[in-house]
């Protein structure tokens, strides 16, 4: 089911079978049902599965607008959970990193993301472009 045009649904789907590292949890990010990019979270600070709202606002820490997500009933703006750039689980303390997984020359898949800044920029461009048209963005975090 595709949402109407004024609501955007972002799904972060973490798969137990995906090769995650000791420190990180990998997943896939979908926007309105279409695959967008890979994700990485710090296992210690991973976002609990659930339903969140997203605001696109200024981040003092990063000095720019970034998507920030929160649980309306448990809202703690000081926590500042966001989608942002980063390559390894150590780059996150509860946020979701966006980027691309890749194969190493040895034939194994990397435990890090690459092109994270590019994917963060692409995600922000979607929010910039749709800011007037989309009235609400919902984030669903699930482990399958």
PLM features per residue range, with description:
Residues 1-137, 144:
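Cell wall/extracellular polymer interaction/catalysis modules
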């Amino acid at each position: 089911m595709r949402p109407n045009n004024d609501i955007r649904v972002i799904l972060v789907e973490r798969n137990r079978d995906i090769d995650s590292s000791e420190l990180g949890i990998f997943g896939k990010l979908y926007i309105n049902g279409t695959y967008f990019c890979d994700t990485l979270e710090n296992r210690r600070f991973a976002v609990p599965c659930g339903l969140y709202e997203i605001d696109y606002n200024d981040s003092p820490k990063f000095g720019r607008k970034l998507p920030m997500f929160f649980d309306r009933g448990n809202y703690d703006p000081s926590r500042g959970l966001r989608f942002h750039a980063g390559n390894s689980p150590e780059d996150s303390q509860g946020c979701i990193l966006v980027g691309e997984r890749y194969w190493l020359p040895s034939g194994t898949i990397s435990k890090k993301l690459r092109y994270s800044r590019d994917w963060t920029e692409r995600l922000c461009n979607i929010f910039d472009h749709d800011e007037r048209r989309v009235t609400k963005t919902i984030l669903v975090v699930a482990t399958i």
